[in-house]
Structures are given as C-alpha cells and as structure tokens.
Regions:
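Cytosolic juxtamembrane N-terminal segment immediately preceding the first transmembrane helix
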Residues: 1-30
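Extracytoplasmic gate region of multi-pass secondary transporters
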Residues: 35-36, 218-269, 357-361
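Helix-breaking motifs and short loop linkers at transmembrane-helix boundaries and internal kinks
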Residues: 47, 79, 100-106, 134, ...
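Conserved MFS/SLC helix-loop-helix module at the cytosolic interface between two early adjacent transmembrane helices
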Residues: 66-102
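Cytoplasmic membrane-interface "Motif A"-like loop-to-helix N-cap segments
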Residues: 77-87, 281-292
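Cytoplasmic helix-loop-helix junction between adjacent transmembrane helices
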Residues: 110-147
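Helix-loop-helix hairpin linking two adjacent transmembrane segments in secondary transporters
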Residues: 145-188
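C-terminal transmembrane helical hairpin of 12-TM major facilitator-type secondary transporters
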Residues: 279, 285-329
Length: 410
C-alpha cells in the first residue's frame, strides 16, 4: 500500500523519466543476453569454437568500464539526457551491425563496441532516474530500476523463442536494434535532470577535472569498487554455473533447467523491488546486510536440497536475496557519489566491479574440478556453496564499514 502511495505521489514527468530509464536498462540487457542463447549457432556460422564466441561475451563485459567512463564524463559535462540518447543509439547500432557480420573478426569488433555502449547506459540512466525522484521514492525506484536486467533476460528468452526458430540468429540482433526507438520517447517526453540543471556550472567545471576527483575521493573510489566487486561476485557466483550444476550434478535436462531459471529470475525481480523499497525505511547498508545474512542461511536449501521442489524454492529465495541486495545499488551509489561526478562515479565503480569479477564462473569451474565427488565428477554444489558463503561474508563486512547517506539531498 505504501509503495502504491509513493507511485501515486510522483508527477507525470517523474513517471515518464523513470520509465525511460527502466526501459533503457531492460533493453540494454536484452541486447546482451540475446547472444548467450545462440552461442552454438554463431560458432557454427563462423567455423570457430564455442570458446571463441564465449570470448566475445567476455570482451563485451571487459569494455563496459570504458563505456561507463566515456559516457559518464559526457553526462557530467553535457547533462544526462542527451548523452543517454547518444548511448542508446550507439549500442543499438552496434547490435544491428552484429547481424551483418561477415566473419568472426568483424563480429568480435562489433561486440566490443557494443560493450562500450552497454557500459555507458547504466550510469547515465541510474543518475537521471535517482536525480528525478523525490527522496522518499528513491528506494523503490532503485529496486525496480535494477531489475530491468532480469526483465531483459526474460525478454531475450521470449525473443529467442519467437524469432530464432523461424529466422535464425542474425534476426535476433536486428530485433535487438529496436531500443533505438526509445530515443524518440526520451526526446519528446523526458526533461534534463533537475539536479544537473541546478548544478550546471559546477558540474561542467568539475567534469574537466577527473584527476582532481580521483585525488579528493580515492578512498571512496577504492571502497566503492571493492563493494561492487563483491556484489558482482555474488550475482555471478550464484547464477552463472547454476544451470550447469542442475544439469551436470543433479541430472536435469535443458528443458527442465529453463523453467527453473525463469522461476529464480522471478525471485530476483520480486527481491529487488521489495528490498529496494524497504531500504528507504531500514537504510541502504542494513538492507544489504540483512539480505546477505539471509542468503547465507539459504545456502543449504539452494544447493544441497535432495528434493527438486525444495531446490527450486531455494533458487527462488536465493535470487530474492541476491537481487534484493542489488536493488539498493543504484540509489546507494548515487547517494555516495560526489555530486559533480554523479554521471561518472556510479557507472565506473559498477563496471569496474563487474570487470574484476569477470572470472567468477571460471574460478568456480576450476575449483569444482579440484573438489571432486566420489564418482570423480566436479563437485559444483560444494564449490558454489563455499564461494557464495565467502562472498556473502565479504559483502557484509564491506557494507558494515561503509557510509550511510540515505535520503541525502542531491
């Protein structure tokens, strides 16, 4: 009821702005996940190994920090709105061009360039959304905004199901260019960030002095990157190898695994929205800690349950907690950010954390081969449980020693 009252209290401009930012992140995630569904087909088309196509996904992730830096600095210099529009057009164009790649090398170049665009969208969208919301609505808005990533995955699954069987993998990337149409909506209905407008003079001056920002805020930068590294290890560590665990260790088929993935993604959406909302009452750090503690308690059900229904329930509630903590991230990083660098700071630390955790799945796979089961097969359950426990503990410590700036005036 209170969440509905908060939504009702938003004016038309605030609702339109938030919708644009949410759709931007959702459609960005859609474009990213489309490739994950057709790795085998792309490899066959270009006569390369699956490993090489997976490298294209990794390269996209590696380029995201560069995109966050470039478009974040543009956002601090010229406002959030126009750089966001340019970014959406850029990553949509790279997605479209991917469909016409004549060979693997060109395909790799387009995916790297797409990674720059993907990295730029989150920081600009999050800062525009948070700066356009009243303080009391930030927690709920943060939780819903972050779940655009999960919505993007579900949307990618639907597009794959509808388009791929009839038109092949290249058509997926043509459909993936449709986010460019969002620019028309932003151009017509979304104003510039009111916070950036008020701070326009100081923001322009500050955006020219990135070195000064680093010198004055280096402790905060290091802390935020460590925090986001823990966050990204938490999400990658509980998601990336979970389908492999279900198939290789629990003996489930692909057709059985897919519905389970949808169920725990629904848990992620619910968790991010609900805990994002309650962070407005409990505080950002306390909400993160609560989610991490409950996540630790869920590990046995999530990974060791002998019965499949319990395992599915464990997956749902584990992602409820993981993405519940993530639901706090957009608002927490924006509240911690130096005001003049709010276009740059959240996106860069988010993407740097993502970059530093890019080896999470590989690390778990290697450890699983070391901690084998009695039959000699990799022990994914034990490995994922240990890594997840360690990451949750690290996240609790980092959240506990950090600053709380809930409701700070922008």
């Amino acid at each position: 009821m209170e969440a509905w009252q908060i939504f009702r209290s938003l004016n038309e401009v605030q609702r339109r702005t938030f919708l644009a930012c949410f759709l931007g992140w959702t459609l960005d995630a859609l474009d990213f996940f489309l490739l994950t569904f057709v790795v085998k087909e792309v490899a066959a088309e270009f006569s390369v190994s699956i490993v090489k196509v997976v490298f294209a996904i990794t390269l996209t992730l590696m380029m995201r920090p560069l995109g966050a830096l470039i478009f974040g600095m543009l956002g601090d210099r010229f406002g959030r709105r126009i750089p966001l529009m340019v970014d959406i057009i850029f990553f949509s164009l790279m997605e479209f061009l991917t469909a016409f790649s004549p060979n693997y090398t060109v395909f790799l170049i387009f995916r790297a360039l797409y990674g720059i665009g993907m990295g730029g969208e989150w920081g600009l969208g999050a800062s525009l959304a948070m700066e356009s919301m009243p303080a009391k609505a930030r927690g709920l808005a943060s939780g819903v905004l972050q779940q655009g990533y999960s919505f993007g995955f579900l949307l990618a699954a639907v597009v794959y199901w509808v388009v791929f069987p009839h038109f092949g993998w290249r058509a997926l990337f043509i459909v993936g260019a449709l986010p460019a149409l969002l620019v028309i909506y932003i151009r017509a209905h979304v104003p510039e960030s009111p916070v950036w407008e008020r701070q326009r003079a100081s923001a322009k001056e500050a955006s020219l002095g990135m070195g000064r920002m680093i010198r004055e805020n280096w402790r905060l930068l290091i802390y935020a990157v460590l925090l986001m590294t823990a966050f990204n290890y938490m999400s990658h560590g509980t998601q990336d190898l979970y389908p492999t665990f279900l198939q290789k260790q629990r003996g489930l088929s692909v057709n059985q695994t897919a519905p389970i993935a949808i169920i725990y993604n629904l848990g992620a959406i619910c968790g991010g929205t609900i805990l994002g909302f309650y962070s407005q009452r409990w505080g950002r750090r306390r909400t993160i800690i609560i989610a991490a503690v409950l996540g630790i308690l869920l590990i046995p059900v999530w990974i060791f349950s002998p019965a499949l229904p319990l395992l599915i329930a464990g997956g749902f509630f584990m992602q409820f907690m993981v993405q519940g903590a993530w639901g706090v991230v957009p608002v927490h990083l924006n509240e911690l950010s130096p005001p003049a660098w709010r276009g740059t700071f959240p996106g860069v630390v988010y993407q740097m954390g993502n970059f530093l955790s890019a080896n999470a799945a590989m690390l778990q796979a290697k450890l699983a081969e070391h901690f084998v089961r009695p039959n000699g097969e990799p022990n994914y359950a034990l490995t994922m449980a240990c890594v997840t426990l360690a990451v949750f503990v690290g996240l609790i410590v980092l959240a506990a020693i950090g600053r709380e700036q809930r409701g700070i005036e922008f």
